[in-house]
Amino acid sequence: MEYRILGKTGLRVSRMGFGGIPIQKIDAERTRQLMLQLRDAGVNYIDTARVYTVSESFLGQALEGIRQDFILASKSMSRDRESMARDIDISLENLRTDHIELYQVHNRSAADLEKIGEGSFVGHIFVSHNNLLKN
């Protein structure tokens, strides 16, 4: 597997990642088998979201004992700081982890991004679908 450093994060991620949305089509046991296969193939980047139904919870179960082998990314569509903090807490619980390396936010103002808590439970914050110039 080839790896790249992700921007200025310092994170070494596999060129091939896994998008967690298809997990809703399989069960928790098959999710565990899939994570072991991905790890053995050298894939270390997993993207998920609470809106992907069972994805985070199945991944949380599946990564037990092998969490350190993966870089997790999740996201939120929340529009205010309190909702975002709640989303992060729920994702941490679902994923059975104490941190998420990459957290993607939608619809946030530039001023609010500084308040979310980058560096504590969230390693790095990425912005998408945002019009920062108007905020």
Label the predicted regions.
Residues 1-70:
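N-terminal binding-site loop/beta-alpha segment at the start of enzyme catalytic domains
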Residues 36, 82-135:
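Glycine/proline-rich, positively charged
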Residues 18, 48, 74, 102-105:
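Conserved beta-strand positions
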Residues 19-29, 73-85, 109-114:
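Active-site mouth loops of central-metabolism enzymes
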Residues 52, 79, 106:
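Active-site beta-alpha loop architecture of Rossmann-like, nucleotide-cofactor-dependent enzymes
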Residues 56-75, 122-135:
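Alpha-helix-loop-beta-strand connector modules within alpha/beta enzyme cores
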